[in-house]
UniProtKB/Swiss-Prot annotation:
Pathway annotation: Pyrimidine metabolism; CTP biosynthesis via salvage pathway; CTP from cytidine: step 1/3; Pyrimidine metabolism; UMP biosynthesis via salvage pathway; UMP from uridine: step 1/1
GO cellular component terms attached to this protein's record: cytoplasm; nucleus
Biological classification of the source: Eukaryota, Fungi, Dikarya, Ascomycota, Saccharomycotina
One Pfam match: PRK
Enzymatic reactions: uridine + ATP = UMP + ADP + H(+); cytidine + ATP = CMP + ADP + H(+)
Record keywords: ATP-binding, Cytoplasm, Kinase, Nucleotide-binding, Nucleus, Transferase
Superkingdom field: Eukaryota
Family named by the database record: Belongs to the uridine kinase family.
UniProt keyword ATP-binding, yes or no: yes
Protein's name in the database: Putative uridine kinase DAS2
Length: 232
């Protein structure tokens, strides 16, 4: 299959956000959701937070090999069994790739191929509390170490490298509106899948019944008119 055909069947969704905002969890939740909604697509999650380079963190973009990450995005899913062939509606299914992590919106090349870019927004106090819970802090010494790391490294990293990527988002989901934000996000991905299937199959699916969790059109959500949609 040529590169153009592969690109036509690839949907990239990028989800960024600050430390301990649940970016990885929402990506896995979306993966499970779309596995239940569609059996004709391959779904992959690329979690940048699990791909930090080296043993010593720099607390900046140099912690990530974006060339390698981009190659993983471009990598075509291989159908490995006859069961896979039977399972899919057609032999070469759509690839849905969810790129997530603090730096998911940092690389320009990944942003350019992403059909939807999302930023999970949360205030500093809530991020710190979530981080303490995530690290399962059990002693005053551990708490002191974590707060030192937060003040000396994580907070400056958020301010200098992660927070600025918020401007690249098409959709901003605040922590106070997660359920509504998730509904909008799911329906946006559904629309991207149906549009892609329509292009592949060469027919109009506008009248086709699809899962309706949130209607972009009915709510006058025009991403071409407005650079991003902020739910706060």
């Amino acid at each position: 299959m040529d590169r153009k055909a592969v690109e036509e069947k690839r949907i990239v969704i990028s989800i960024g956000g600050g430390h301990a905002t649940g970016v990885g969890a929402i990506a896995l939740d979306l993966q499970n959701t779309f596995k239940s909604l569609y059996n004709s697509i391959n779904i992959r999650v690329i979690n940048l937070d699990n791909m930090i380079e080296g043993n010593i963190k720099s607390y900046n973009n140099n912690d990530y090999d974006f060339d390698n990450i981009l190659n993983l995005v471009y990598e075509k899913h291989a159908v490995t069994s006859q069961n896979d062939m039977i399972q899919h509606d057609y032999e070469d299914p759509i690839d849905l790739i969810i790129v997530c992590g603090c730096y998911a919106l940092y690389d320009k090349r990944i942003n350019e191929i992403s059909q939807l870019k999302v930023f999970l927004d949360s205030d500093a106090d809530k991020r710190l509390i979530s981080l303490i819970k995530k690290k399962n802090v059990g002693s005053n010494e551990q708490l002191a170490q974590l707060i030192t790391e937060y003040m000396d490294h994580l907070r400056p990293e958020m301010q200098q490298y992660i927070e600025p990527t918020r401007t690249f988002a098409d959709l901003i989901i605040p922590s106070t509106n997660e359920n509504l934000g998730r509904a909008v996000l799911v329906d946006g991905i559904v629309k991207a899948i149906e549009d892609t299937k329509s292009q592949i199959e060469g027919n109009n699916t506008n009248n086709k019944i699809r899962p309706r969790l949130w209607d972009f059109e009915a709510e006058t959500m025009d991403l071409e008119k407005d650079r991003y949609y902020d739910l706060s």
